[in-house]
Every structure is written in C-alpha cells, then in structure tokens.
Amino acid sequence: MNKSLMVTKRDGTQEQINLDKIHRVITWAAEGLDNVSVSQVELRSHIQFYEGIRTSDIHETIIKAAADLISKDSPDYQYLAARLAIFHLRKKAYGHFDPPRLYDHVKKLVRMEKYDQALLDDYTREEWDTMDGFIDHWRDMTFSYAAVKQLEGKYLVQNRVTGEIYESAQFLYLLVSASLFSKYPKETRLDYVKRFYDATSTFKISLPTPIMAGVRTPTRQFSSCVLIECDDSLDSINATASAIVKYVSQRAGIGINAGAIRALGSEIRGGEAFHTGCIPFYKYFQTAVKSCSQGGVRGGAATLYYPIWHLEAENLLVLKNNRGVEDNRVRHMDYGVQLNKLMYQRLIKGSEITLFSPSDVPGLYEAFFADQDKFEELYVKYEQDPTIRKRTVKAVEIFSLLMQERASTGRIYIQNVDHCNTHSPFDPQVAPVRQSNLCLEIALPTKPLQHINDENGEIALCTLSAFNLGKIENLDELEELADLAVRSLDALLDYQDYPVVAAKRSSLARRSLGIGVINYAYYLAKNGVRYSDGSANDLTHRTFEAIQYYLLKASMNLAKEQGACEYFNETTYAKGILPIDTYKKDLDSLTQEPLHYDWESLRKDIQEFGLRNSTLTALMPSETSSQISNATNGIEPPRGHVSIKASKDGILKQVVPEYENLMDNYELLWDIPSNDGYLHLVGIMQKFVDQAISANTNYDPKRFEDGKVPMKVLLKDLLTAYKYGLKTLYYQNTRDGAEDVQEDLDDGCAGGACKI
C-alpha cells in the first residue's frame, strides 16, 4: 500500500493518508466479534484507494469491504460493517463521533424546522436533561449492517435532496417516545418515555416506517393502512378517487372496495344509458393510485376487492395477467376476491355459481357481509327468478380460473368475508367488514363516501406495531409490552392529522390498532419446534393467547383511565363476546392446549369498563422493520440462512438470528414439504387475532409431476385455509429456480405502509 498517497479531508484540505488511523478504527469496530479479520477488511479496501480520495470515500470503501465479507461462516462482519457505518453516520450528522446533548440537539433541529416545535413547548429544559440520561448511545452498536442502511435510507431525519443527515438512531427512538407521551400527566410521562424508549431501542417493540420516519417532525401523518369503500354512483366513484389521491400522497397503502359497482350493460336512469361496467372505473382508480410518486421512488399501491359472484367476475379475474390488450387489463393494482361458505359449498358439491350485477339483486350485496343465512336465502331466490339478468358457471371452473390467476400473478388475494364477520370484534348488523387493506391483515368496517367531505362515509385507518418474539424470554413480559404498545399507538391517534373527515371521525371513534409479531421463525427455532410437523402448534396457541389477552387487558385498563372508545357499543366485545367464543372449532383437532389466562374476569371487566380500542391485533408483513431489529420477517419462514435484499440503498445481506447455534433448527421456506403445517399455525393464530393475518401460500413446482402444481393441490390449500378459519390469503409464492436468498425489498407495499 502506498503510504504517500494524498487524501482530501472533509474541509477540502489535503494530507498524507494515515493508515494507522484506519487500522485503529477497524480494530475498534472488530472488538468482541467472532471470526472477523481486520487485515482482510484493510486488504480489500486498500486496493480501492487512489490519489486525492476524499476521507468520506475512504470510510465508505472500508464499510463496503466489511459488508462484502458477510456470510454464513462469518456472520459477525454484519456488526463490524454496522459499527463502521454508525461511526461514519455520526461524523456526517455531528462532525464527530460523540452525539451532542439532547436538549442542544432538539433546539437546533427545531430551529432548522426539521423537528416539531411542540417538542420544546411540551417539555421543560430540566425534563430534556432527565431524558438525556435515559439514552444509551451504545445501543447503536447492536444494529446489523442491513439495519444501519435502512435507518439511513428510510428513517433518520434528513434532507432527501442533498443527502444531509441530522440525527442518529437513539435520538430517533427517544424523540418518538417523547412525542407520543407528551400529553400524559407530568408526574408519569417521563416514566412512560423511558420505558417505551427502552422497549423500542432494544427491539422488543417494532414500529412501522411512517412512525419511525415521521413522529418528531412537523408532518403528522402516520396512517399505515387506509380502507376506502366505493358505492355504485358517479359521485361516490369520484369521491373514492379523490380520497385515494390524498392518501397515496401521504405514503399510505390503499385497500379499495369496488364490489358494489354495477356490471357492464346495466341500465342507467331507467335505460336511457348503457353502463360501461367495472373495468373503466378500475382504470380510473389505478390512475389515482399511481398519480403521486412517494419521494420520487414509485407510485402508490392498492388492492381492489370484489365478490366472486359479480356478473363480470370472469373478466375481472384476468385483469392482472400478461395476456389481453390494454383495454381489458388493469395490471398495476392487486386484487382481493371475496368468497364465503356458500361459494365453497357449491365448489365441493360440484355444482354451479350464479353471477349477478349487485344493482339487479336488492339486499344481496349487503347480506354477503352482514348475514350469511339471509345471503343464501336471497341468492337462491334470485337464481330462480327468470326476470333477473344472470350468468351461470360451473363452480369448479370459476374457482380454477381464480387459482390459476393467483398462481400466475402471485397477487390475486383471497378474503373469506363470512369469517371476517363471524369471528370479528365488530357486530356485523351495525358495522360489517366489507373489505381488507393493501396487505390483507386489516378487517375494519367502512362506509362509502358520496362526496369527499361526506361525514357519513367511513374510511378506515389502522395504526400498526409489533412484538419481537425473539426478544421475549417469558410470556409474562408481554404484559408490560402490551401496555406500552397500546398506550403509544392510542396516543398517536390523537397526535396525528387527518386529511379526510370521513377518516378522522371513524379513527377517533373506533381507535382501531393492529399489533402483530416479527421474528416468529427465530422464535420457533429457539424453542426447537418446526412449521411443518405440528410441533409448534401448542407453543403458538400459548403465545397468541398471551398476546391477545394482555392487549385486551391493556386496552381495558386504558378505558378505565381515559374512557372507552366512542363506538365501543358497535363491537362484539361490548356484548361480552371474546375471540375464544367465536373461533372455528375445527382448530381443536390441531391443538389440545388449554387456555392459561383468566378470560372470564377479563370478560367482566370489559363489560364494566369497556375497551379504549375496537381492535388490537393484526399480523402484517414486516420486511423493513425486521431488518432494523435483525429479525425474521413477520410469521414467515426464511428463504435462506443469509438473505440478500435489494433496495435502493444497495444490496443488503442479513444472517438469521443466532445462526451458529440454531442453523439446524431453522426450517427454510423451500424445505417445507407442503402448506399444511403453516396454514394450521396461521389458523391457531387467527383463533386469537381479532383482525386478519397476511398469510402466504408457497409452491415449489419441482415437487410435482411434470414440474406443474396441480389445480387440486391449489384448491385443497384454499379449502384448508377456509376450514381453519383464515380470514385472508396474501401472496402466492412460486419457486422459480432463481437464487432463493435474493429478495426485492420494495415489493409494492407503499412506503412500507401496511407492513412494518
């Protein structure tokens, strides 16, 4: 290595390269790590140095050299690279390694208009000094490399045009806590700030992108998931498009229910016009969804819902595929096809399904969600009425078309609307669930808007976070974590702004939360159980019972303190009904695990004090926040022991937690022989989860004759999911023979919106 090389410092002056200094920094970063070599990193970076290189480029070269060495055999390079990256990041943010005092930092950033003025108005200087004592900046050193790159790319407050970064991670965690608990009484709030800071900065509670990036800044917009329902009128269609644009611009992911729109050829105004059908309006919604690109990265994303018995269903099912022409395809949205028991029964019996336009069959569309018996009665009555326009198809043909499109696009999703309403926290007579969201984990009531300022409409919003199961040693720890998670998200509802009245009204009256889990695959590996063989069933039952029990208890305690939510009377909880009463009894064949908590006294307390929140749980995908916490994604099995994720911040390698000790315990996605074990586990989770679960189905064609997945396997899995009470199915993944570890991080969930 040429020791006389000249380098350019941050202030523009030149000096001779100082190899000792570089050696000291790498040695510092390698301290306490196993199986990493300082000289390897030096060697790989030295060959890339050149005359006049900037010191910041030297730093980035060293970081990259360390990151390139991350592998199964030496996973600790992910921490060496991370420490070097943290060092670099702090130099960029503060000019030196040690962060400033908290109060000075906040004052400076409020003055620069990067932080919210409320931070200084709500807390005194003494309180800031106390909070400074809560911060442990060394926690930065527990991040993996992928986490630091995600923080830099998505979460830290920065100027996205110039690339300047203004803060480091521990300030982010503390200021999110301080913002959320700012309206709590002075006597208790610092205690909550400290405990929530500790829970989030040690990765026990995981927060979604909008909260991590936005809380503490002047922009108060953190809705993760937005559900918008459309009626069968031009005014409502326009109001829906307008609401979509407003929310897409705020980085939210959208669920659209367009199932009520009448079919092609229906009469308009008593026959003076001929209706153009659904497709032109779906195109209109697609244009609205793609109209705003978020931070110049990409357009928004939406999933659009309709019932399988819609007269146009055969044309709607193919909207996403690559055949056809522009006129009859709407490819840039995903679709959720709505099913219920009657449709499955027709399939099993080998009989027929009749397709109608919702406009021709009064009461049928409403009953599809609110009352299954009434739906069947009306459906059969309309089938026999010769005056009603209809089309009859073999059930197996339309189900096969549905599953064929799901297989070829991967993104035709399933919603079982009867399960969404019979095993629901909402009373379907007054607040039926008629759709889900972008990623299929939300099940909340909606009402169509007739115009954009319609106060009688209802746009559903859901606020998310998750427990990191890998960090939980004992299920009783969930009691405190549940209390913190519920209090923080509930406070967020009052802290944020709402761009559309129909969303504000319902969000504040229902106060729906969706708290999920990450790191489930590590949790199973750590406990020595597997997805595929039933060994995880009892553990999963115990775990999700504890989660739902402690969350309900936390929400009940908060209701005691701050009052029940305004629409509590629209929930089944108000009638004394709990998830343990309405679950699908077929699950009892999968696990005989008894209930371990005192549900009966909780039932009494809920009837006496109410709940602060209508819903508490939803199991969402979690690509981004899993990287921050160095966890496995949501409830999914990992594709490989090392995952390589491509994102706009480059290629990020991440090794599964505790790889050296647990490598044989992890069950990798494509080693799992069928979907049964996974679907059984999701069913057990759904027994307790009050909203829905982003559950995927996975197929490796090589396991089947001729390398093709047989239709009967696809249909069997669909029926298994229904049998065990699954409300929704999300992606269908087909193994394509490419390297399994490669995943694309931006897979359509807008701004990480409905994921966390």
Curated annotation (Swiss-Prot):
The keyword Acetylation is annotated on this UniProt entry: no
Signal peptide positions on this chain: none
Catalytic activity: a 2'-deoxyribonucleoside 5'-diphosphate + [thioredoxin]-disulfide + H2O = a ribonucleoside 5'-diphosphate + [thioredoxin]-dithiol
A single Gene Ontology CC term: ribonucleoside-diphosphate reductase complex
Pfam family name, one: ATP-cone
Positions contributing to ATP binding: K9, E15, Q16, I17, N18, L19, D20, K21, T55, K91
Keywords, in A-Z order: Allosteric enzyme, ATP-binding, Deoxyribonucleotide synthesis, Disulfide bond, Nucleotide-binding, Oxidoreductase
Top-level taxon of origin: Bacteria
Purpose: Provides the precursors necessary for DNA synthesis. Catalyzes the biosynthesis of deoxyribonucleotides from the corresponding ribonucleotides.
Family annotation (PANTHER family): RIBONUCLEOSIDE-DIPHOSPHATE REDUCTASE LARGE CHAIN, RIBONUCLEOSIDE-DIPHOSPHATE REDUCTASE LARGE SUBUNIT
Name of protein: Ribonucleoside-diphosphate reductase subunit alpha
